[in-house]
């Protein structure tokens, strides 16, 4: 059974990964504006491309910019202050076609825009269409000639999801083959670590809440959601590899919550819709108040699901980065000794926070999966007599 479940899980994960990738690309990647001065905010994380340590009138450290720089999405993966890996920029210009190039092609214009360093405006010329793209740290990306374009570039979050999707599909396929090669035998290696997690989602979440007869129908999605969130959260905890914040990206959590809403709505039975639009045992006059509240609650549930995951995962990163910021602030305002002392304290606190974030990484995956299972159970429960 585990072998068949793992294969369905891998297929469901692949499908969900494609949907999440598309959503993450469209989040903040809308149609280009018609002029450079009215640039739309197509990349919510473009400000992450500059170094906040250079901000301020005299190179002063600005904590807010530093934190946003690390948790926002971007078109590059920043490893150190002076080293980053560029990602593909993909633009579709209406009537001209596609422009594909690496984000490192954007170069500072210099005195033409009167900006240098952190707030320098950069430009790049599309290799296919000849369109000149202007990259403003505050306004996003626009075209110099007013061409209308669509930005479907690979961002840091999209790259992270592609990596996770590839890794988990390979691991799960290997896990399924392991059961096929060694039927009836105890699992070994990585399978020995993953099987308890699969059984946990099945035996402690899906079956007790949804019911044994209906749990298998929703189990592939619940496993997909659980492992995707866990893997995304753990990737975000690895230091010095770009500061991934996948589940803190609203476009990703919107898709996860929307899929939960669609599955709940599609699988809702007569009992579910009856309780929603005509609650039994409620006076007719009271129903005029209850029904709108119930309908509003139907849309509120996935919204809360989305906000809870995004806020909790972003909050952990913000707290850690805030204590990192204190080191620079104390060093800047009170000298190197104060900065060193704060560095020792901040390091100890950040170690504690990392262990706490490790717990939260699994806890948030559990909570999201648990609530999804509860919604599915509410939609499919039979009438009680």
Task: Describe the predicted segments one by one.
Residues 170-209, 271:
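Hydrophobic transmembrane alpha-helix segments characteristic of membrane transport
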Residues 158-163, 245-257, 261:
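Selective recognition of hydrophobic, aromatic-rich stretches within alpha-helical transmembrane segments
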Residues 10-20:
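Bacterial N-terminal signal peptides
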Residues 5, 185-189, 210-219:
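Membrane-interfacial loop-to-helix junctions in multi-pass inner-membrane proteins
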Residues 219, 224-238, 251-363, 368-370, ...:
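Hydrophobic alpha-helical transmembrane segments and adjacent short intramembrane/lumenal linkers
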Residues 2-5, 21-188:
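Perimembrane topogenic segments of multi-pass inner/organellar membrane proteins
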Residues 144-149, 201-215:
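Cytosolic juxtamembrane amphipathic/interface segments immediately preceding
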Residues 239-244:
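Membrane-interface helix caps and helix-loop-helix hairpins in membrane proteins
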């Amino acid at each position: 059974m585990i072998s068949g479940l793992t294969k369905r899980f891998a297929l469901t994960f692949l499908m969900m990964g494609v949907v999440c990738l598309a959503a993450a690309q469209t989040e903040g990647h809308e149609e280009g504006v018609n002029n450079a001065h009215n640039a739309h905010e197509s990349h919510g994380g473009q400000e992450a491309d500059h170094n906040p340590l250079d901000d301020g009138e005299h190179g002063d450290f600005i904590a807010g910019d530093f934190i946003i720089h690390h948790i926002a999405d971007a078109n590059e993966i920043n490893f150190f202050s002076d080293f980053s890996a560029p990602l593909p920029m993909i633009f579709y210009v209406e009537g001209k076609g596609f422009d594909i190039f690496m984000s490192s092609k954007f170069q500072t214009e210099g005195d033409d825009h009167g900006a240098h360093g952190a707030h320098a405006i950069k430009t790049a010329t599309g290799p296919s269409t000849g369109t000149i793209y202007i990259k403003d740290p505050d306004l996003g990306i626009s075209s110099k000639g007013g061409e209308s374009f669509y930005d479907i570039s690979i961002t840091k979050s999209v790259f992270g999801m592609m990596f996770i999707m590839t890794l988990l599909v390979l691991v799960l396929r290997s896990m399924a083959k392991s059961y096929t090669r060694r039927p009836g035998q105890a699992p070994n290696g990585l399978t020995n670590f993953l099987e308890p997690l699969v059984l946990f989602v099945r035996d402690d979440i899906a079956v007790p809440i949804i019911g044994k007869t209906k749990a298998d129908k929703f189990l592939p999605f619940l496993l997909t959601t659980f492992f995707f969130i866990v893997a995304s959260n753990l990737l975000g905890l690895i230091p010095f590899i770009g500061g991934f914040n996948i589940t803190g990206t609203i476009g990703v959590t919107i898709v996860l919550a929307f899929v939960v809403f669609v599955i709940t709505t599609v699988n809702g039975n007569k009992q579910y819709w009856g309780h929603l639009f005509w609650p039994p045992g409620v006076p007719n006059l009271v129903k005029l108040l209850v029904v709108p509240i119930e309908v509003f609650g139907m849309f509120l549930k996935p919204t809360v699901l989305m906000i809870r995951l995004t806020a909790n995962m972003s909050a952990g990163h913000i707290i850690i980065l805030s204590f990192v910021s204190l080191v620079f602030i104390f060093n800047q305002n009170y000298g190197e000794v104060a900065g060193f002392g704060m560095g020792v304290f901040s390091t100890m606190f950040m170690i504690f926070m990392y262990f706490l974030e490790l717990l939260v990484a699994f806890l948030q995956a559990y909570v999201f999966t648990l609530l999804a299972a509860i919604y599915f159970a509410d939609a499919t429960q039979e009438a009680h007599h």
